[in-house]
Amino acid sequence: MSGVSTAAYFARRAAQKERVRILYRRALKDTLNWAVHRHIFYRDASDLREKFNVNQDVEDVDRIDKLIAHGEAEYNKWRHPDPYIVPWAPGGSKFCRNPTPPAGIEIVYNYGLEDNP
């Protein structure tokens, strides 16, 4: 194996590891969207981890690419149609909601240091 092909192999493996990590994290977060209670989520998360652990010892890079593509397709097929978004996060109901203060309210910047005549 030459130096260039070795570097290309390691770069491809690093990219695959990153794709698997991202896929697992997205699938785990989506599992939380489907679970109503935590005890259901824990069971589903354990099942998801087992699915990933089955193929962790595969060394063939082409087979790994096929497994990742299959996993991404399965994730897209089973994504939750209405995922939970926390209110203050982008896409949440309260994101960037800063109401203007009512008229007549003034801000005192030197609180406690006012001049008392």
UniProtKB/Swiss-Prot annotation:
Complex I is composed of at least 49 different subunits. It is a peripheral membrane protein. GO terms for biological process: carbohydrate metabolic process; mitochondrial electron transport, NADH to ubiquinone; photorespiration. It comes from Arabidopsis thaliana (Mouse-ear cress). Expressed in roots, stems, flowers, rosette leaves, cauline leaves and siliques, with the highest expression in the stems. Accessory subunit of the mitochondrial membrane respiratory chain NADH dehydrogenase (Complex I), that is believed to be not involved in catalysis. Complex I functions in the transfer of electrons from NADH to the respiratory chain. The immediate electron acceptor for the enzyme is believed to be ubiquinone. Is required for correct plant growth and development. This is NADH dehydrogenase [ubiquinone] 1 beta subcomplex subunit 9. The modification N-acetylserine is found at residue 2. Its main location: mitochondrion. Keywords: Acetylation, Electron transport, Membrane, Mitochondrion, Mitochondrion inner membrane, Respiratory chain, Transport.
